[in-house]
A protein has these predicted regions:
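Structural signal for interior beta-strand "rungs" in well-ordered beta-sheet cores
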Residues: 137-212
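Terminal amphipathic alpha-helical/low-complexity segments used for targeting or macromolecular assembly
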Residues: 1-149
């Protein structure tokens, strides 16, 4: 499997975030753009070039899976995904949804929806990503108040003590070795990245990602 992320002139709109790394390393939701594509790309034998600002979605992924060598998809003059050298690609117009990060504020405006989408994709992927819901934990903290426990996903190595986890408006994802200290209040959709620490009495509101 080989995914290649290709910058276009649109990366300048993401400055200063893209001074030191590409747009594909920006985290929107739980995962970075490159993590999303690598998680979802199923054609292990095939390489794919991807616009580094492009967020994946199910329909676009399916269309990309069906592309043959030398074929590509464009929308509004912007290259989306393709196989081969761009000057030799036979392009087709993509009239479905294509979602981008164009300016730094897009990362924050799209974050809540991307948390919800990432949760679904991660659970479908299984393996190390398939975190048990709070309602399935064998050792839940009895001093933690949880609303919609089926929407709260906590890595077994994470520590949650005497907190309020409100997933009534969106999922809460707590990653590996994260710590939620006593008195913390978290209202989903929220992603707490691996090795992150939420200090005592902190309030984290929806559409937020903390760490890693």
């Amino acid at each position: 499997m080989a995914l290649t992320f290709v910058d276009d002139l649109g990366v300048h709109g993401l400055l200063p975030l893209t001074y030191t790394h590409g747009p594909q390393d920006c985290r929107v939701g739980i995962l970075t753009l490159s993590q999303k594509w690598n998680l979802l790309w199923r054609r292990q034998e095939a390489s794919l070039s991807v616009n580094s600002r492009l967020l994946p979605n199910d329909a676009l992924l399916l269309a990309a899976q069906l592309l043959s060598q030398g074929k590509g998809l464009r929308q509004g003059g912007q290259d989306l995904v393709w196989h081969g050298q761009t000057d030799r690609v036979e392009w087709s117009n993509w009239d479905g949804e294509a979602e981008w990060i164009t300016h730094p504020e897009d990362i924050f405006l799209k974050n809540g929806f991307q948390i919800r989408r990432d949760v679904n994709w991660l659970l479908e992927a299984g393996g190390e990503w398939a975190l048990p819901a709070w309602s399935q934990r064998v050792d839940p903290d009895l001093h933690t108040a949880v609303y919609r426990p089926e929407q709260v996903y906590v890595h077994p190595s994470a520590i949650v003590r005497a907190a309020v986890l409100d997933a009534s408006e969106g999922p809460i994802w707590i990653g590996e070795s994260a710590e939620i200290m006593a008195g913390s209040m978290i209202k989903g959709p929220v992603a707490i990245g691996e090795h992150s620490s939420i200090k005592m009495g902190a309030k984290i509101y929806g559409d937020s990602t903390v760490g890693p």
